[in-house]
C-alpha cells in the first residue's frame, strides 16, 4: 500500500553539552546525535524517503552555539532561521513544491 502523503525527514541539531544534564536528569551528547542521525539517514535511504542531514554541518559551524536556546537543546530564532534557509535551498523540497 502506497502512502498518499509526501514525507521528508530532516536530521538532528547539535546540543550544548555544557548545559547537561537537561532538567537535572537527561544527558544529551553530540556524539550520540551524530550516531542517531546516521541511523535515521540509513532508514530513509532504505525507504526511499528524502533526508536532509543537518547535524555535521551545524556542529562544524562555530556560530551554532548561538543558534541554541538557553536550555542548550532547542533552537532559538536564529537556529530556526538557519534551518529555514537550508530547507529553502533543499533540492528534494524544491522538486516537490514545483511538481
Predicted region positions:
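A short helix->loop->beta-strand "cap" motif at the edges of active sites that frequently abuts
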Residues: 1-7, 49
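Substrate-gating cap/lid alpha-helix
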Residues: 17-54
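Alpha/beta-hydrolase-fold catalytic nucleophile elbow
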Residues: 10-11
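Short acidic/His/Gly/Ser-rich catalytic and metal-binding motifs that mark active-site loops
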Residues: 16-20, 59-65
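Short low-complexity, flexible loop/linker segments enriched in glycine and/or proline
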Residues: 23-24, 66-69
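Histidine-centered active-site loop/cap adjacent to the catalytic His
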Residues: 38, 47-50, 69-99
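A general structural signal for short secondary-structure boundary/capping elements
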Residues: 55-56, 78
Amino acid at each position: 500500500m502506497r502512502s498518499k502523503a509526501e514525507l521528508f525527514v530532516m536530521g538532528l541539531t547539535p546540543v550544548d553539552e555544557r548545559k547537561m544534564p537537561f532538567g537535572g536528569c537527561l544527558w544529551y551528547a553530540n556524539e550520540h546525535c551524530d550516531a542517531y542521525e546516521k541511523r535515521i539517514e540509513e532508514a530513509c535511504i532504505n525507504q526511499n524517503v528524502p533526508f536532509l542531514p543537518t547535524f555535521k554541518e551545524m556542529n562544524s559551524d562555530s556560530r551554532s552555539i548561538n543558534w541554541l536556546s538557553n536550555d542548550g537543546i532547542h533552537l532559538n530564532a536564529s537556529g530556526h532561521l538557519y534551518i529555514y534557509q537550508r530547507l529553502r535551498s533543499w533540492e528534494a523540497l524544491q522538486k516537490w513544491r514545483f511538481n
